[in-house]
Structure formats: structure tokens, C-alpha cells
Amino acid sequence: MPSEKATTRHLPGAVETLSPRTGRRPETPAYGSWLLGRVSESPRMRRVRIQGMLTVAILVTNVIGLIVGAMLLTVAFPKPSVILDAPHWVSFGIVPGYCVLAFILGTYWLTRQTARALRWAIEERTPSHDEARSAFLVPLRVALAVLFLWGAAAALWTIIYGLANRLFIPRFLFSMGVIGVVAATSCYLLTEFALRPMAAQALEVGATPRSLVRGIVGRTMLVWLLCSGVPNVGVALTAIFDDTFWELSNDQFMITVLILWAPLLIFGFILMWILAWLTATPVRVVREALNRVEQGDLSGDLVVFDGTELGELQRGFNRMVEGLRERERVRDLFGRHVGREVAAAAERERPKLGGEERHVAVVFVDIVGSTQLVTSRPAAEVVMLLNRFFTVIVDEVNHHRGLVNKFQGDASLAVFGAPNRLSHPEDAALATARAIADRLASEMPECQAGIGVAAGQVVAGNVGAHERFEYTVIGEPVNEAARLCELAKSYPSRLLASSQTLRGASENECARWSLGETVTLRGHDQPIRLTSPVQQLQMPAQSADIVGGALGDHQTHTIYRGAHPTD
């Protein structure tokens, strides 16, 4: 039993791939089998592949049917003998001649009808709605053609052999009828499999599949009828004909039943295998695609190649992935407009008006001489320059886990400590300011900017109305950073911070800054001590005018070496 289960479990792999099995299960191809090629395959190569598969599948199926029929007519029902008790010109002339003619005419007619139905694929164009619906009928037409040829053979041979001996009549009707139905159904399923690439293109235009049976239930019941119904009917008819016409011995009756049962068992096994594989493959494709989505890959859609409910499953997966892609696009745009941290906070909890007190550090950056910059350059060049300028700022702010809260013309405001809490927001802000100053000096020497850094308590939250609001920070540190940025434009370093900001910084960061003079910023009552990167702070010639004459006495510049500054 374990060996049988293992064999059954691995059988579908023989259809999926011809390559040896490795330790890792190969990924299911887009059409469910490597035999059908890739989606990117050229149309000409796909036509050759499909035509070859159809020809081989139909010929092999019918050759096997002829072999089984010969066994039934000669071994299962030996009397009367089709060789000894029938005219030789029938057994060695009519029958072989009909088989050859049926193969030739059948192959020609099926090839022509298939090519006509798939003309759009040969011409490498998108099918119309009617052409797409016609493509779904190809498997049914193939099955009906095969059934017609077997039915014609049954009628012709029954009449000819019946004229020689009436006992041939039920034998030929029964044998040819059963084999014809099984062969036609096998050709139907194999043709449906081979035409999956064409069905996928037809489904893209929205055509409704038209087939012999509808849905998974219809397909399953059809195979059940052939695998279980036909053998049972065959055994019952054998018993009836034996009692009525043949009068077989017990041994001969047993041989007849076994010969009738064995081929139908094999054919039934093959049909059930094909049915199980046709059903499982779309599910496996969707399952593997779900695994890719779970890993964050939303790049690919499934090829919808099944006309049953499984095709609706594939279509539903594509709609789901498109929705996820749209959601990611909206999330990306939202994050670009308001900042990744604000977007993440909005996803975690429903946004509401109001805010909370936070300890943050603020970096304000503004271009020096922006009016002259705008008037001296074309508008397109100014936009490109501003984009490069803001790219430097955004890169460094993101690198230090800050939030670019606003773009105001040629200025920007970055916040550290809101909405994401930071253990040392001063360190992050000061390091960001230094990095921006260094990069602007090296990468954009034509664009100089003043940079101000301040820290303290602010109110951070959503400001506006219920219909339209934005996340921002309000408080004295924001105003102080803006005034320091304005003052920094007159210093060679272009970067100033307050000594209060350095009080909250680490010793490692403080060692990179130098204390300067004490000033009273415009709009402020209390003086503050300026700091700037080490060995860069210099007093401007007309700084008294800039700070409103409140500079006071010149302070001695000292290098800060680890001790916290005091006013």
C-alpha cells in the first residue's frame, strides 16, 4: 500500500516535466506544464508545439483503440472468428483500408478545421469575440470527429460482417461503440490540455467557454461515466449476449470479461489521471503564486487557461493581486506626500485631529539667495536644481530616521522624534545637519543653504479640518530653527545650532561642535549661545544688523570637547 500511494502521488510530475526530479519541487509553469512551453515563446514555435502534440495524442489514442478492438474481436469473442468465418477480402481488405483512409482523412480534416478555428493565432493577432468562442469548440469538434469515424467503422463493419454471420452484429456494435466513446473522450481531454495557450488568449478577450461539459462537476461526471459506467454496462451486455447469442463456456466468459475489463481499467486510470491533473494544476499554480505574494512579490499575474471554475479562481487571484498592487501604489504615494512614518502611523491607528507633547529636534534648511536664483535661471532649470537639493535633504533625513515634514518653496523642515520616537533626537538632527552641509558643499556648490538646528518640547499631531488635515509640529523649537537658519546664511559654515540642543546630545556628537557667541534671535526675548561644527564658526562682518543689534559683546570661540555647554 505505501508503494502504491507513493506512485500515485508522483504520477502528475511525469506530465509536468520531463527533467529529472531534484530535491526541490520545480515551480509550476504558467500553463501548468513544461510541455506547453512558456508565455514568452514565439507564436510560430507555439503553433508547431501544439500541432505536434495534437497529432501525436490523437494518433496514439486511436492506434491503442484499434489494438484493444482487435483483442476484443479475436480473443475475447473467438467464435465466430473474424478470420476464419468471414470473407478474407473484408478482414484483410476493407478493414485495413478503412483504417488507413480514416487516419489520413481524419488527420487532414482535423488539421484544417483546427487551423481555421485558430486562424487568429496563426496570423498573430488578438482574436475577436466570435473567434475566441470558436476556439473553445475545437476539443468538442475533435471528439465528435473521432466519434464519427469510430461510429462509421462500427456501422460499416457490422453490416459487412453481419452479412456473413449475424453473430458478428452485437460483437462489432458493442466493441466499436465502447472503444469509440472512450477514444473520443480521451481525445477531447488531451486536446483541451494541448490548447491551453490558445484558451488563455481567448479568455483574455472575455469570451465565455463553450465545451462538451460545463465546469468541474460535468468534467468529473463524464470521466466517471467512462471509467465506471461503460465497464459495468459492458459486463452486463456481455452476460446478456452470451445468454442470447454466443453461449460461451465459463472459462471463455471469464476471459471475455477480463479482456473487456483490463483495457477499460487502463483507459479509465489514464482518464482519471488526466482529469486529476487538469484539476490540480490550476490550483497548484494559484498556490505557488500565493506563496510569492506572501513573500512580497506582486509583480506577476497568472495566465488564465482554464474555462471551468478553476479559471474563475485564477481570475480572482489576478483581481486580488491588482488590488494589492493598487494598494501599494497608494501607500507609496501617501508615504511620499506625508512621509513614511506618518503614513505608517495612519495605518496603525485611525488619524484624528489634535496632538501630543513630544521632545523633538528640528532641522530647518533654506537656500541662500533664492530670489536671485529664480530670476537668473530658466524655470525648468530651477526645478531640476530644487529637486537635486531636496534629494540630498530627504536622503540624509531618512538615513537618520527623521521625517521631512514640509517643503516650503526652497526651504524644508525635518523633525526627529515624531511621529517615531527616538532615544536621542538631538544626535540624529545634528548628524543630519552636518551631513547635509557637507553634501551640499561637495555635490551642489552652486546652491548654498543655511541650516538651523534646535530641540525642545513641541505639540505633534494632525492640524486642519476633518475633511483635510496634515501632520505637523508646533512649538518654539520650530521657530528657533527657522531663525538659526536665517542667521546661518551669514556664516561661512552655513550651519548653526543652539547650545540648548547640544545639552541633549551625546558626548560623541558634542565633540564635533564648537561654541560661539551669545545672540538674541529676532522675535525672541532670551539670548542663546550659538554652536557650529568644529573650527568653522566665524563671526560675520554685519551680524549685528542680522540679529537686530542684540549680539552684545564678542564671545571667545572655544572648541567643545565633551563637557556640556553652558550659557
Swiss-Prot record:
Residues 278-329 form the HAMP domain. It is a multi-pass membrane protein. One of its GO terms (molecular function) is adenylate cyclase activity. Keywords: Cell membrane, Membrane, Transmembrane, Transmembrane helix. InterPro entries: A/G_cyclase, Adenylyl/Guanylyl_Cyclase_3/4, HAMP_dom, Nucleotide_cyclase. The keyword Transferase does not apply. Residues 361-485 form the Guanylate cyclase domain. It is found in: Cell membrane. GO terms for cellular component: cytosol; peptidoglycan-based cell wall; plasma membrane. The chain crosses the membrane at residues 57-77, 90-110, 142-162, 173-193, 221-241, 257-277. The keyword Membrane applies. GO terms for biological process: cAMP biosynthetic process; intracellular signal transduction. It comes from the Bacteria. Residues 1-26 are annotated as: Disordered. Belongs to the adenylyl cyclase class-3 family. This is Uncharacterized protein Rv1320c.
